[in-house]
Amino acid sequence: MENKDIRKILPHRYPFLLVDRIIELEEGKRAVGIKNVTSNEPFFQGHFPDNPIMPGVLIVEALAQVAGIAVMNVEEFKGKLGLFAGIDKCRFKKVVRPGDQLILEVSIDSIRMGLVKAKGVAKVGEEIAATAELMFVMAEE
């Protein structure tokens, strides 16, 4: 799924759209996305100018956006908005820097009454950069 197709599903736009491409998608079950981290990212201006590191919270947001694509492409949730309801067991294990390609793997554990629970793993190559359990609620836009 190319970026233009992602923009048809997610409401996020630059500089907060953190998924460049979806390379695997099983609607309502799982998705794998890519974020190519460049030195031009606006967050590197302040985090940190002489030692650029992608903020962990933005890695988690990128995972959430991939989860949103997996769910918001399901017919009953098209046109709805995924709102964060919680983040559990979040761990950061590797620094993400300009030039890295972030692989964002998300599996949907459950969808009940509009509450989505998912697990995400962000990797650079084969190294795990971050893991998290995500919860979000599907709401009307």
From Swiss-Prot:
Matches recorded under InterPro entries: FabA_FabZ, FabZ, HotDog_dom_sf
Entry annotation: catalytic residues: H47
Biological processes annotated in GO: fatty acid biosynthetic process; lipid A biosynthetic process
Main localization, broad class: cytoplasm
Localization: Cytoplasm
EC number, as in UniProt: 4.2.1.59
Top-level taxon of the source organism: Bacteria
UniProt keyword terms in alphabetical order: Cytoplasm, Lipid A biosynthesis, Lipid biosynthesis, Lipid metabolism, Lyase
GO CC list: cytoplasm; membrane
Reactions performed catalytically: a (3R)-hydroxyacyl-[ACP] = a (2E)-enoyl-[ACP] + H2O
GO molecular function: (3R)-hydroxyacyl-[acyl-carrier-protein] dehydratase activity
Function according to Swiss-Prot or TrEMBL: Involved in unsaturated fatty acids biosynthesis. Catalyzes the dehydration of short chain beta-hydroxyacyl-ACPs and long chain saturated and unsaturated beta-hydroxyacyl-ACPs.
Family statement: Belongs to the thioester dehydratase family. FabZ subfamily.
Protein known as: 3-hydroxyacyl-[acyl-carrier-protein] dehydratase FabZ
Species whose genome carries this gene: Caldanaerobacter subterraneus subsp. tengcongensis (strain DSM 15242 / JCM 11007 / NBRC 100824 / MB4) (Thermoanaerobacter tengcongensis)
